[in-house]
Every structure is written in C-alpha cells, then in structure tokens.
Amino acid sequence: MQSSYCPSPYRYTRRVTREVMVGNVGVGGSNPIRIQSMLTSDTRDTDACVKEALELAEAGCEIIRLTAQTKAYAANLENIARELRAAGCHVPLVADIHFKPDAAMEAAKWVEKIRINPGNFVDKKKFEVREYSDAEYREELDRLKEEFTPLVLFCREHGRAMRIGSNHGSLSDRILNRFGDTPEGMVESAIEFAQIARDLDYHSLVFSMKASNVKVMVAAYRLLVERMNALGPDWNYPIHLGVTEAGGGEDGRIKSAVGIGSLLTDGIGDTLRVSLTEDAVREVPVAYRLSNPFQPSERSDDPVSFPEPELSYDPLKFSKRQGGLAMYYGVRLGWEQPVRVAVPDAGFYALQTEREAMGDMMPELSLGQLDAIEVDPRCDADLEPLKELAEPSIVTVKNGLAMEPVYAFRLLAARIEDRHLILLKDTLVPGSVSGEDVPLTAARNIGSLLCDGIGDAVLIQGESDPRLASFLGFNILQATGTRLTRADYVSCPSCGRTLYNIQEATARIRKATEHLKGVKIAVMGCIVNGPGEMADADFGYVGGAPNKINLYVKHTPVKFNIPQEEAVERLVDLIKEYGRWVDPK
C-alpha cells in the first residue's frame, strides 16, 4: 500500500506548506517548528496572566494561548495584551474559543490568532442520534456559514490568523451521525469550516486534529494531510500538533512523544504544544526536546537511497500486523498475544529477585532467550534465508545501521513474510541517547511503530538500568493502548476554565486507583469540554463549579456538586458500585 500522506514512509521529508503569520511569528514554510503553550490563569486576572505569559516567553515559548469562554473574558484580552506589550513582550497571543462566536469576535480585536473548535463553534452537543437527509445537512452547513462568516471577514481584514482545531471528543452531533466518532469525522469537521473561509478568500489558516488516544490522533492527522493533498496544492496549510489530556509526569511526556513524535517523523507538523497536567512553563522544554531533531537547522530531507516497497499496512487505519505464533521459554509471542517486553540478559537475571516488587512491570524475556535474527532490511542477502525457515522466527534490525529505527522497522515489516515476528528497538546505537531524551526518543520510535501495528516485542536499549528499561517499555505500551498494565488516565492540562486544583486532584486519584488494571479515568477541569473530551473513559471526574466536582460514568453525569475534598473518595465508591474495583495488593 502506497503512502498518501507523505512522500515516503522510509525516509524523512518535511511537508511543504505555505507560511502563515501569527503576529510577528511565521508558521510553516521554511520557519522552525514553533513551540506553544497555554496559560492556566483565569483570563479575568490580568496580573496573573501577564506574569505567567512572561514566564513562558522567558522559557522560549513562541506562541501563547488563553481561554476566552465568554465575551466578558475575551474583553480582558485587551488589558493583557497591552500590559505584555508595555513590558516588551511581543509573543503572539491566541484566544481559545468554544461555543461562543461573540467571544471570538471580541477576542479577535485584541489577539493575533483565534482558535476555534469546529465541533462546538456553532453546534451545541446534545448526543442526539438522528439521520440527516442531504437537504437537512445542507441547511446545517448554511447555518454554520452564516455564523462563521463574520469572524472570517474580521480576521481577513485585520490580519488575524486562525486555527481550525478538531477534537476527537467534541465532534458535533451532525458530524457524529454522518461520519461517526472517527478520524474521518474529525477531518470533515475541519474541512467544512476551511471551505467557508476559502470561499471568502481567507487563507491564514492552521489545522489541528487532537485526541487523547494517540492511535486516533496519528490517524486523523495523516488523513487530514491526505485529504488536503487530494483537494489541491493550494491546501498547503500549516499544521499544529498536540495530544489532548496527555496527563503529567513521565506518562504525559511519553504519550505526547508517541503522538507528536510519530507525526514529526512523517514530516508533519509546523507548531506543537505538549499538554501536561503541570505548570505551563514545564511544557516548553519538553516541546523543544521533541522538536529539536526535526528543526530545519538540524536536518534536511533524506535522499532516496534504496528501493522503497509498498507499505505492508494501511497507515490511515490501525490494524495489528498479524504474524505467526511462536513460543520462547514458555512465553507466547505473535498471533493475538500481548506485545512482550524484553531486556538484555544480565539485567533480566538481575531482576529475578525483584519479581514480586516489579509485579506486572516485570520483563517477560531476556534478549538471549528470544534468539532474534538480526538483519539489515535493505540487504537481500540478509533477508533471503528467512524464507527457508520452517517455523516463524523473531527478527530485528541490526545495531549500528545508519538508519532511524522507525524507517528501518517499517522497511523490515514490508520485506519479510507476515509469519515472522518483529522485535522493536528504541535505538540502533546504544549509548547515543542520554538523560531526559531517553524516554522521549524511545516513545517516539517504538510508539510510532506500535501505532502502525508493527511489533511483537520491545527492547529498550537506550536505558542501561534494566528496571527502568522495563518500566519504560510497559509505559510505552500503555500510552499507545497496546497493552494495559494499570489504570489509564485522561487528564487535561488545565487552563483558565479549570474550576479546581487539577494537579493535586490528579495525583490523589492516581494514588487511589492506579492498581485498577484496564480502568480508564478522565480528570477534566471544567464542563465546557469535559464530557466530550473524556473520549472512551469509564469514569469521569469533572469540575462543575468552583471546587465542586461532578462524577461521570462514560458520558453520563451521575453525581453532582461534590466538594473537592470528598470527591476522590466518592469516585472510589462509584467505581465499586459499578463492579470495577479490586483491592490493591
């Protein structure tokens, strides 16, 4: 299968886009990949917003977003912008708009860019199931055009940029009923708005396709690029990358690295934000670590250096590569088996005394037990002997090759028979990555391949401590949804809409529930996006009023206005009520 979203899945080529100016910052074209973040302060609090924005600018943030949930909030953007400019800070400001076209019109007077969510800019989500006739659908689009046109015309006349940012969890009922809760629906939602803007000769557009599920996120961005390529060469708009509700700590960093890093490897992405449930300033250095290897100053497009076969999978629809079935020391690999975690021999045997402490994070095999066949996927002489093997074998890429792991393993998957299994590696040059780059690089390389459905086992070579290497391997499997070994969390990064201390609440919820393998809990700051953005969570903890929490089962609110100090205990009670609780070991 040919790649339709990038020139080649086997080498780096940055997607060519037009330049869009966001104030004094160029996005796309030949510009660097720009780093963004979002204020957590209340937009009505001018001093707090200015202080936080100055800290972000000092940290290297190039574009700063603020929430503007009503026209009154948006009006205070005038004061924030004036104070920042008076302080000598000229970082462009972006107003984040949901549900309120009048807030967008007010905000556009004062900031350099407007972000709209096409799922709720006009449509009010009611979770209704209905069939739309073509005529009814057209009427809805006409209503959308009527509401959206004034903002487009204002932005065009005043030099404002706009991001059309679809979110997986907040698609409109109209889109859901026609396209489903899918990447196709996310793309169509954005294209509808973009077509209206283009018809009005407005082109200062940036797009995003965010989701908390990284497989959905990667598929949606790829599908967006494929769709824009098909629509014509003048649909060459820049793209902003982000994983919504990635969480905090190492989990949030790994999840962001999987989603954002996968797309950067594909040459997609002109701006990015790492959304962490932490102070906003802590997002910036992580964003730079992710983007640095792909900045134009660091690398150029790779030349064609070997014959490039068709892909062995559909990059727009996730499907696990189904290899054969093999048994190694009592551990099954391959067909319908979980992806396994391996570590080098010495580390594996050293960990045997820690089996009880390691629990579900214990590596299942040593590298020696796997007896993997190492090959250069470009070399016919290495691959031909595999055809003669009677049984499925586990194959990996040789260390030391001058290839990036993602491209090397994609090539391997395309060139070997499906019956053979694949051992993924985070790096082909052990020792070449160090410090904080180790988990980000591993998550980018292994996570990208897992999102492509490639891999039957993983080996972390960049981390020398076998315990940490095993934890990292399982955390990457968790982040991609490939294999769950503990509770999973969808946690929003906080913004000016957040109604309680979300960092503290998230930490308490994790401490109480982390042992609940396979249970997915959403921790959301407010009811503006909370119910929609919870995606496929089993339970939700959502701010309903200042320091008051509403609890959800799936998308349904079941408990209301619980004082924050009681809410975690009540969440545990709810999990017990629905039969998902087990006592920690």
UniProtKB/Swiss-Prot annotation:
Pathway: Isoprenoid biosynthesis; isopentenyl diphosphate biosynthesis via DXP pathway; isopentenyl diphosphate from 1-deoxy-D-xylulose 5-phosphate: step 5/6. Keywords: 4Fe-4S, Iron, Iron-sulfur, Isoprene biosynthesis, Metal-binding, Oxidoreductase. InterPro entries: Dihydropteroate_synth-like_sf (IPR011005), IspG_atypical (IPR017178), IspG_bac-typ (IPR004588), NO2/SO3_Rdtase_4Fe4S_sf (IPR045854). GO terms for molecular function: 4 iron, 4 sulfur cluster binding; 4-hydroxy-3-methylbut-2-en-1-yl diphosphate synthase activity (ferredoxin); 4-hydroxy-3-methylbut-2-enyl-diphosphate synthase activity (flavodoxin); iron ion binding. [4Fe-4S] cluster binds at residues 492, 495, 526, 533. The keyword Repressor does not apply. Its cofactor is [4Fe-4S] cluster. Its EC number is 1.17.7.3. It is an enzyme of class 1 (oxidoreductase). Binds 1 [4Fe-4S] cluster. It catalyses: (2E)-4-hydroxy-3-methylbut-2-enyl diphosphate + oxidized [flavodoxin] + H2O + 2 H(+) = 2-C-methyl-D-erythritol 2,4-cyclic diphosphate + reduced [flavodoxin]. The keyword Iron-sulfur applies. One of its GO terms (biological process) is terpenoid biosynthetic process. Converts 2C-methyl-D-erythritol 2,4-cyclodiphosphate (ME-2,4cPP) into 1-hydroxy-2-methyl-2-(E)-butenyl 4-diphosphate. Belongs to the IspG family. This is 4-hydroxy-3-methylbut-2-en-1-yl diphosphate synthase (flavodoxin).
